[in-house]
Amino acid sequence: MAVVTMKQLLESGVHFGHQTRRWNPKMKDYIFTERNGIYIIDLQKTVALLDKAYDYVRDMASKGKTILFVGTKKQAQETIKTEAERCGMPYVNQRWLGGMLTNFRTIKKRVKRLNELEKMEEDGLFEVLPKKEVILLKKERDKLERFLGGIRDMKNLPDVVYITDPRKESIAVAEARKLNIPIVSIVDTNCDPDLIDYIIPGNDDAIRAVKLISSKIADAVLAGKQGEQLTEEAKPEDKEDEKGQAEEKEVKEENNSANKEE
């Protein structure tokens, strides 16, 4: 069964591409037709490719892998935060800071600084410092929280990056490709599909379209995590089965020895 129905995609406006003069010829295979100067995306391909992306993300999540959600333009910011938090994954929904992946060591230092500032406030240190210094420290903390708050628990580089608009997030795409991190992305008619590993042809401007697709990626993470949990829960049982089989084998061997002696 498909992850989404054609009706859901139509209702969310996933089929609306960009104006025909603003297209990337490489997207030709994913375009159904043209209507009033706007390209209409082939939703049959969207259904099939979203299924493929869903399966991939679910499988990665089932192995305990990290999927980084990225969407910094206005239409995606709230959705990215909501869906990433819902499935317990890191996210970037404000400005992408250059080097977030390629210079991750420095980013980790900035996250450490954010944690230090928050601890200072919790410990009441802000109350004894000069007022001007506290204002500057709070300003620094707020800025770090805004840009790095979504990745503060990301201890290592992500295993997959999910992006809502590869043109807007061109730096994130370039960094992920440089580090050979697979990219799952919504790809509109003005994008280059060759840069993406798992493409989802669709409207990257409509809030409802971004929300629908992003929610399915989050669902895939949750389904994968549930599978991982079930596997871990099954492990003790497997050990019990192995123990039982060994004991059964031992009893059989003892019986055989007794029969031979008789």
From Swiss-Prot:
Keywords: Ribonucleoprotein, Ribosomal protein. Pfam families: Ribosomal_S2. GO terms for cellular component: cytosolic small ribosomal subunit. GO terms for molecular function: structural constituent of ribosome. Residues 225-262 are annotated as: Disordered. Coiled coil: none annotated. GO terms for biological process: translation. InterPro entries: Ribosomal_uS2, Ribosomal_uS2_bac/mit/plastid, Ribosomal_uS2_CS, Ribosomal_uS2_flav_dom_sf. SUPFAM superfamilies: Ribosomal protein S2. Residues 232-262 have a biased composition (Basic and acidic residues). PANTHER family: 30S RIBOSOMAL PROTEIN S2 PROKARYOTIC AND ORGANELLAR (PTHR12534), SMALL RIBOSOMAL SUBUNIT PROTEIN US2M (PTHR12534:SF0). Belongs to the universal ribosomal protein uS2 family. This is Small ribosomal subunit protein uS2. It comes from Halothermothrix orenii (strain H 168 / OCM 544 / DSM 9562). The gene is rpsB.
